[in-house]
Every structure is written in structure tokens, then in C-alpha cells.
Amino acid sequence: MSRTIMAFDFGTKSIGSAIGQEITGTASPLKAFKANDGIPNWDEIEKQIKEWQPNLLVVGLPTDLHGKALETITPRAKKFAQRLQGRFGLPVELHDERLSTTEARSELFSMGGYKALSKGNVDCQSAVIILESWFEAQWG
């Protein structure tokens, strides 16, 4: 059975999202949700979850280059993951997101130059990278 997985790139101002199928190991960008100090419009996220009906949610875990937690943002990403699980009753996994934003910017720039580098595009592409990295980790 192939599962549908939805990923989130948590940020205090914007939360990117992506969707993917476990069978193909590929992901596509969805939507960037505006956040107010890390708090999204939960109704918008609920609408997306109802539309796509994922079996699992993956949240990018921000760390430094050595994999250590970042003092301010890492605990907030974990809290966001807990809230997703509590609100929607879906399993949630955290996944290392080191360098995902840098990689997302590079990919978007190569596809469309500076015009492609909007905050929403970068956050959604970061969610794609997080999810595809999660797929790779599952197949080890």
C-alpha cells in the first residue's frame, strides 16, 4: 500500500507545505501558509489536509550544521508538530531539515532566476526537499 505523506517547513512567518507518494518517493509543492509568530490559520491547514487526506505528516526539524537543536526555532517546530498531531489525529514525524532552504533557493533560482525566489516558493520547495529526504531515509 502506498501512503500519501504531507510535509511542512515550519517558520514563524510562513509555513511551506508539500505532498508526496511513498511509492514514487517524489514530492510536489502545495501552499505556503502565513503564520503569525509561528501560529498558522489552522482552518487553512485543515482544509488542505481534508483535500489531500495524507496518512502521515512530516515536519522539518531545524538544526545547526552539526545536527544540534537551535535554541529558539527547534522547540517551536516540535510544538507545531505536536499541535498537528493533536488537532488532526494523524501520525507526525520530525525530519532533519539542515540546508533545505539553501537547496530550495538554489533549485528555484536555476529554474526561474530571482523572480522564483519568493518566500512562499522557497518555503514550499523546502517542504519538498524535506519530504524527499524523508523518503530517502525510509529506504536507507
Swiss-Prot record:
EC class: hydrolase
GO biological process, one term: rRNA 5'-end processing
EC number: 3.1.-.-
Functional summary from the UniProt entry: Could be a nuclease involved in processing of the 5'-end of pre-16S rRNA.
Family statement: Belongs to the YqgF nuclease family.
PANTHER family: POLYNUCLEOTIDYL TRANSFERASE, RIBONUCLEASE H-LIKE SUPERFAMILY PROTEIN (PTHR33317:SF4)
Protein name: Putative pre-16S rRNA nuclease
